[in-house]
């Protein structure tokens, strides 16, 4: 199955800005990989909460629509809230 997530590049980085994003129902994330610069991104929580329940989400290649260009990535790590059904941060690697 193919998954697509719309995202924007983050300009503010740090604990305070990440908390503000989470309170606004956004998920901070990063895309990294060998030979490429890491890119801090943000996307809506509703875009990922439902698709991450599928088993093939973690093993398939995702498409992130990043400010008009498509980037192929795979999920490396996902941080979740301790007891709420919230995703706090996602690490993606270039596919």
Curated annotation (Swiss-Prot):
What the entry lists under Pfam families is as follows: Ribosomal_L25p
- Which BP terms does GO give this entry? translation
Please give the Gene Ontology molecular function terms for this protein: 5S rRNA binding; structural constituent of ribosome
* GO CC annotations on file: cytosolic large ribosomal subunit
What keywords is this UniProt entry annotated with? Answer: Ribonucleoprotein, Ribosomal protein, RNA-binding, rRNA-binding
Per the record, the domain of life is Bacteria
Q: Which InterPro entries match?
A: Rbsml_bL25/Gln-tRNA_synth_N, Ribosomal_bL25/Gln-tRNA_synth, Ribosomal_bL25_short, Ribosomal_L25_dom, Ribosomal_uL5_bac-type
State its role: This is one of the proteins that binds to the 5S RNA in the ribosome where it forms part of the central protuberance.
Family the UniProt entry places it in:
Belongs to the bacterial ribosomal protein bL25 family.
What is its quaternary makeup?
Part of the 50S ribosomal subunit; part of the 5S rRNA/L5/L18/L25 subcomplex. Contacts the 5S rRNA. Binds to the 5S rRNA independently of L5 and L18.
- Note the PANTHER family from the entry: RIBOSOMAL PROTEIN L25/GLN-TRNA SYNTHETASE, ANTI-CODON-BINDING DOMAIN-CONTAINING PROTEIN, RIBOSOMAL PROTEIN L25_GLN-TRNA SYNTHETASE, ANTI-CODON-BINDING DOMAIN-CONTAINING PROTEIN
Q: Which NCBIfam families match?
A: PRK05943.1
Please give the name of this protein: Large ribosomal subunit protein bL25
- Identify the species of origin: Shewanella woodyi (strain ATCC 51908 / MS32)
The encoding gene: rplY
